[in-house]
């Protein structure tokens, strides 16, 4: 798309959130600009070279279900695929892929380049243009101005980014790239109170100097399981990763120098991610352990750089050089680049509506680390939702809210806008109350129809989705129609309750010890079912009774979510306590359900709100 001076939507930042936001907006038909320093940095993996994992893999599948980019790009760049928790139930399994950094970035850049309605504008966004309380454009550092109907800010760690390496500090968005200073000032001028968060990265190692024979080797799954339903097979060559551990000697080096770590010297005062601690934090907090696991992850097929996952650190460079040889396999390793920590600005996510539009400024949307999250996948999911809603806002359409029963992206956004954060937010399956239905394997069944209705899913995905649903429905109909008595089942080696009742092939697969292969051996007509469809059918059967039970909880949840509070003046709602009024006014919840998730909100206050909404609805109906 040719560069213009006016767009429907402008997305600032070309990271994981920005790419999804820009592509989603463009798929919605909005003329979109992606503003980034350099096209060459689009899709860069700033930290670990991996996509997915526990909870995170669910988000990637949900992004894919809404025709997002991350799943397909990870499939193109993935060099080791593994499903985590494979021995556990499907609801908590997490697809993950080790990626080749160059292949991943190239695939993302290609996807952005090929997206209709999307232009990439190289430059630094320096200020927001605001007219009558609404964002109407942006100013670039080189003096250019771009007009628009909505802006999505996805700046990652660039907002007043400050790198820490031992006692040294310098401004940067990531190593080798300048921070974004103007946007922080612009957000503060609007009235946002910016907080500070911290993240870190480990040193990079020369893989040719690692003693691979001294470490455990880990292979990927064979065959590899793709992220995207549109990917038939993984064609990229696959690699092994190594596993080693820190030692007592490693811990001694760290303890002797921990006072030089910015986290412990007082140099860094912001909070880092709880579930991705630095190696010095591990030694201080878990000093009784004799070792901590390290995954040696190659960064590419033609790149000898290795990412040592598990030793993120901001200790001085000379200390990092001293601790590495104490680790088995790394005795003679060459450090290519030291690890470091980075602090950056973020906005309190309670300043956001569930659409990811800010409450204090119409037309302004935020996604990714600026909202207090950590991780590529969390950023991508937010970017997609923000991009869809920015396009809807620019076009005058009604916003879309994904709730906690829709998917992990709904869980994450609700957690952020309702509860806020005290540390970088990471997705886990344990955060979802409806995780039996929010599985990685059924993301398309949950979300693709919504995407089609919105207009962000089209083309080949629509045709594929409809064929898949039709095949699954047909397979379920066949499996439900085939029945057997307990006596007949016994002839096939199955032990069932001798109650005389006939059970279908679908019902039999609900038993833990009975899989699709077993029922197929009883009924040869099931052999015609596609293996992928058969896997979905078996999982649906295993969870069927629990899903039907959970659907009652979802219905009750959705009734509360259907009671929209809007812009209520809580000062005029009779019966509310002063404490409840203060909490509601500060949080500005979207629905009764969201109000109920505010810390300290009482059932009595919720009852008063529900009664008030009913009275207002009757009054408005009578007036009309």
From Swiss-Prot:
Domain of life according to the entry: Bacteria
Broad class of where this protein is predominantly found: cytoplasm
Cofactor: FAD
PROSITE patterns per record: GIDA_1 (PS01280), GIDA_2 (PS01281)
Subcellular localization(s) per the UniProt record: Cytoplasm
Any one of the GO BP annotations: tRNA methylation
SUPFAM superfamilies: FAD/NAD(P)-binding domain
Gene3D superfamilies (UniProt xref): FAD/NAD(P)-binding domain, GidA associated domain, C-terminal subdomain, tRNA uridine 5-carboxymethylaminomethyl modification enzyme MnmG/GidA
Stretch forming the signal peptide: none
GO MF annotation list: flavin adenine dinucleotide binding
Residues involved in NAD(+) binding: 272-286
InterPro entries noted in UniProt: FAD/NAD-bd_sf (IPR036188), GIDA_C_N (IPR049312), MnmG (IPR004416), MnmG-rel (IPR002218), MnmG-rel_CS (IPR020595), MnmG_C (IPR026904), MnmG_C_subdom (IPR047001), MnmG_C_subdom_sf (IPR044920)
Binding site for FAD: 13-18
Pfam families: GIDA, GIDA_C_1st, SAM_GIDA_C
Keywords for the protein's UniProt record, in alphabetical order: Cytoplasm, FAD, Flavoprotein, NAD, tRNA processing
The keyword tRNA processing belongs to this UniProt entry's keyword annotation: yes
Assembly with partners or alone: Homodimer. Heterotetramer of two MnmE and two MnmG subunits.
Family to which this protein belongs: Belongs to the MnmG family.
Role played: NAD-binding protein involved in the addition of a carboxymethylaminomethyl (cmnm) group at the wobble position (U34) of certain tRNAs, forming tRNA-cmnm(5)s(2)U34.
Protein's recorded name: tRNA uridine 5-carboxymethylaminomethyl modification enzyme MnmG
Organism for this UniProt entry: Bradyrhizobium sp. (strain ORS 278)
GN (gene name): mnmG
């Amino acid at each position: 798309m040719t560069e213009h001076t006016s767009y429907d939507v402008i997305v600032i930042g070309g990271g994981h959130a920005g790419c999804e936001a820009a592509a989603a907006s463009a798929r919605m038909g909005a003329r979109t600009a992606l503003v980034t320093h350099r096209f060459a940095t689009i899709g860069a993996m700033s930290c670990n070279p991996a996509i997915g994992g526990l909870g995170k893999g669910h988000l990637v599948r949900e992004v894919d279900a809404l025709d997002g980019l991350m799943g397909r790009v990870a499939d193109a760049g993935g060099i080791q695929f593994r499903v985590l928790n494979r021995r556990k139930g499907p609801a908590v399994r997490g697809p993950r892929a080790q990626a080749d950094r160059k292949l991943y970035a190239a695939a993302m850049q290609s996807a952005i380049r090929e997206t209709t309605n999307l232009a990439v504008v190289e430059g630094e966004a320096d200020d927001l243009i605001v007219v009558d309380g609404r964002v109407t454009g942006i100013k670039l550092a080189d003096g250019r101005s771009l007009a628009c109907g909505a802006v999505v800010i996805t700046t990652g760690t660039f907002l007043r980014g400050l790198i820490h390496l031992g006692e040294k500090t310098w401004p940067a968005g990531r190593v080798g790239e300048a921070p974004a200073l103007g946007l922080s000032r612009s957000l503060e001028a609007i009235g946002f109170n910016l907080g500070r968060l911290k993240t870190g990265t480990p040193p990079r190692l020369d893989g040719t100097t690692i003693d691979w024979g001294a470490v455990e080797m880990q292979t990927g799954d064979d065959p590899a399981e793709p992220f995207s339903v549109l990917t038939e097979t993984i064609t990229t060559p696959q690699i092994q990763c190594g596993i080693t551990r820190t030692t007592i000697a490693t811990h001694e080096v760290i303890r002797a120098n921990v006072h030089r770590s910015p986290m412990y010297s007082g140099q860094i005062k912001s909070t880092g991610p709880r579930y991705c601690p630095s190696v010095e934090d591990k030694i201080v907090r878990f000093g009784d352990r004799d070792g901590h696991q390290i995954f040696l992850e190659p960064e590419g097929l033609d790149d000898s750089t290795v990412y040592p996952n598990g030793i993120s650190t901001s200790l001085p460079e000379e200390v990092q050089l001293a601790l590495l040889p104490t680790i088995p396999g790394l005795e003679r390793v060459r450090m290519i680049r030291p690890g470091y920590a980075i602090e950056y600005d973020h906005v309190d996510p309670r300043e956001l509506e569930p659409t990811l539009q800010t409450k204090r400024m119409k037309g302004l949307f935020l996604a990714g680390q600026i909202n207090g999250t950590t991780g590529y996948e969390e950023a991508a999911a937010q970017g997609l939702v923000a991009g869809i809603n920015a396009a809807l806002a620019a076009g005058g359409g009604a916003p879309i809210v994904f709730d906690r029963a829709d998917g992990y992206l709904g869980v994450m956004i609700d957690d952020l806008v309702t509860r806020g954060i005290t540390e970088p937010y990471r997705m886990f399956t344990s955060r979802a109350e409806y995780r039996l239905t929010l599985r990685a394997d059924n993301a398309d069944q949950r979300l693709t129809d919504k995407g089609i209705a919105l207009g962000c899913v089209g083309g080949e995905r629509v045709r594929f989705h409809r064929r898949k649903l039709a095949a699954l429905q047909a397979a379920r109909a066949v499996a439900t129609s085939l029945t057997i008595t307990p006596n007949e089942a016994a002839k096939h080696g199955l032990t069932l309750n001798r109650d005389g009742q006939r059970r279908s092939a679908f019902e039999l697969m609900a038993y833990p010890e009975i899989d699709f292969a077993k029922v197929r051996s009883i009924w040869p007509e099931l052999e015609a079912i596609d293996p992928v469809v058969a896997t979905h059918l078996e999982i649906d059967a295993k969870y069927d009774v629990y899903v039907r039970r959970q659907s009652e909880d979802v219905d009750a949840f959705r009734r509360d979510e259907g009671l929209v509070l809007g812009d209520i003046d809580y000062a005029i709602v009779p019966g509310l306590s002063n404490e409840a009024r203060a909490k509601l006014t500060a949080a500005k919840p979207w629905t009764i359900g969201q109000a109920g998730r505010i810390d300290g909100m009482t059932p009595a206050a919720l009852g008063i709100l529900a009664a008030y909404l009913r009275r207002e609805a009757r009054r408005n109906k009578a007036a009309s």
